[in-house]
């Protein structure tokens, strides 16, 4: 059944993207590029965005099919809720930017409050209504230490889901970068899920992998379409949710290490400039620093993919031991 789900997810995305691209162009749903960014990116102005709709539709359709064939499919239902919730926030943000011609999109406060609402509902569905059972203890790898958080765990969930949804969003600045890293990350979690006897989560990860594989050829440099906030916010929220449901939260710090580094580079850059009026990097997120240092876009992407693969394998090893 997993093979059938994988094929369905792959085909839906692969078929939808070439249909959506001319539609987005006709509707003038093109990406605007920051003038202060690398000059090589200016040629990307007008590239269709909101392409994340294609793999989100694929994930939703294929997951609904999976619910009827996978034993104990409650985890898939919960992951679908997170997918739709964070995807909807991203879609509204993209819509305001592209259609309303407001480059700010949703305000930080609006986006943050919406993300918090989804995280809280996720906690209620899982812990209070017992849609899915998981521990509210935070396990420390390689130790017998388990920190009981009880209802404070909802604060952790908010921090984790909001943090990683925005981390993937920050990383999605080069053609294929976030898509490739996500494929690597979900592959690690697919393996971990089956090893830890969580086949429903594993099935969802398989769906994620193949839905993204259908999108990747169109997103590689030179990208024919960008996933937009529609895709990136959803991917980050899903990563955080899977790590929570497997009770392997801290594994995401390694499986999603590149996302963490990208986010840290932005935070350090902002803090440094506010405190010293000096910048640590030529530009943040850090992938732009390497571009401005003379690296080609494809080189940055492949090096970051490699780093993500290595750290992901380490995170997988820690997660299953």
UniProtKB/Swiss-Prot annotation:
Q: If you read the UniProt record, what top EC class would you report for this enzyme, in one word?
A: transferase
Query: Where in the cell does this protein reside?
Result: Cell membrane
Query: Which CDD domains does the UniProt record give?
Result: GT_MraY (cd06852)
Reactions that this protein is recorded to catalyse: UDP-N-acetyl-alpha-D-muramoyl-L-alanyl-gamma-D-glutamyl-L-lysyl-D-alanyl-D-alanine + di-trans,octa-cis-undecaprenyl phosphate = Mur2Ac(oyl-L-Ala-gamma-D-Glu-L-Lys-D-Ala-D-Ala)-di-trans,octa-cis-undecaprenyl diphosphate + UMP
PROSITE patterns attached to this UniProt entry: MRAY_1, MRAY_2
What are the GO BP annotations of this UniProt entry? cell division; cell wall organization; peptidoglycan biosynthetic process; regulation of cell shape
Span-the-membrane segments of this chain are 1-21, 50-70, 76-96, 112-132, 140-160, 176-196, 200-220, 225-245, 250-270, 300-320
Arranged from A to Z, the UniProt key words for this protein are: Cell cycle, Cell division, Cell membrane, Cell shape, Cell wall biogenesis/degradation, Magnesium, Membrane, Metal-binding, Peptidoglycan synthesis, Transferase, Transmembrane, Transmembrane helix
EC number(s): the record gives: 2.7.8.13
- For whether the record's keyword set contains Cell division, the answer is yes
One GO cellular-component annotation of the UniProt record comes to: plasma membrane
The set of disulfide-linked cysteines is none
What InterPro entries does UniProt report for this protein, alphabetically? Glycosyl_transferase_4 (IPR000715), PNAcMuramoyl-5peptid_Trfase (IPR003524), PNAcMuramoyl-5peptid_Trfase_CS (IPR018480)
Q: Name one Pfam family in it.
A: Glycos_transf_4
The main location class comes to membrane
Q: How does it sit in the membrane?
A: Multi-pass membrane protein
Query: Which coenzymes or cofactors are required?
Result: Mg(2+)
The pathway noted for it is: Cell wall biogenesis; peptidoglycan biosynthesis
MF-aspect GO terms: metal ion binding; phospho-N-acetylmuramoyl-pentapeptide-transferase activity
* Purpose: Catalyzes the initial step of the lipid cycle reactions in the biosynthesis of the cell wall peptidoglycan: transfers peptidoglycan precursor phospho-MurNAc-pentapeptide from UDP-MurNAc-pentapeptide onto the lipid carrier undecaprenyl phosphate, yielding undecaprenyl-pyrophosphoryl-MurNAc-pentapeptide, known as lipid I.
Q: Which family does it belong to?
A: Belongs to the glycosyltransferase 4 family. MraY subfamily.
**Which HAMAP family does this UniProt record tie to the protein?**
MraY
How is this protein named in the record? Phospho-N-acetylmuramoyl-pentapeptide-transferase
Q: Source gene?
A: mraY
């Amino acid at each position: 059944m997993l093979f059938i789900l994988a094929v369905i997810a792959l085909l839906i995305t692969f078929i939808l993207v070439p249909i959506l691209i001319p539609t987005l162009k006709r509707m003038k749903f093109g990406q605007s590029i920051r003038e202060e960014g690398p000059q090589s990116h200016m040629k990307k102005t007008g590239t269709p965005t909101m392409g994340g709709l294609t793999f989100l539709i694929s994930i939703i359709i294929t997951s609904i099919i999976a619910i009827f064939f996978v034993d104990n499919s409650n985890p898939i239902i919960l992951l679908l809720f997170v997918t739709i919730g964070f995807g909807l926030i991203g879609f509204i943000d993209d819509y305001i930017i592209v259609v309303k011609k407001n480059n700010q999109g949703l305000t930080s406060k609006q986006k943050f409050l919406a993300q918090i609402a989804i995280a809280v509902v996720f906690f209620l569905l899982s812990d209070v209504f017992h849609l899915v059972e998981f521990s509210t203890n935070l396990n420390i790898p390689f130790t017998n230490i388990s920190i009981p958080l009880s209802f404070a765990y909802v604060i952790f969930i908010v921090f984790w889901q909001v943090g990683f949804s925005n981390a993937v969003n920050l990383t999605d600045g080069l053609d294929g970068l976030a898509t490739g890293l996500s494929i690597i990350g979900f592959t690690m979690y697919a393996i971990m899920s089956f090893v830890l006897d969580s086949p429903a989560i594993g099935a969802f990860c398989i769906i994620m992998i193949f839905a993204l594989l259908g999108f990747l050829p169109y997103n590689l440099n030179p990208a024919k379409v960008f996933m937009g906030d529609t895709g990136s916010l959803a991917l980050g929220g899903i990563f955080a949710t899977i790590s929570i449901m497997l009770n392997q939260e801290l594994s995401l710090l390694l499986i999603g290490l590149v996302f963490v580094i990208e986010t840290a580079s932005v935070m350090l850059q902002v803090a440094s400039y506010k405190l010293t009026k000096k910048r640590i990097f030529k530009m943040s997120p850090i992938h732009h620093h390497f571009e401005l240092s003379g690296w080609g876009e494809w080189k940055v992407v492949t090096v970051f993919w490699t780093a993500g693969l290595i750290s992901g394998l380490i995170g997988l090893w820690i997660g299953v031991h």
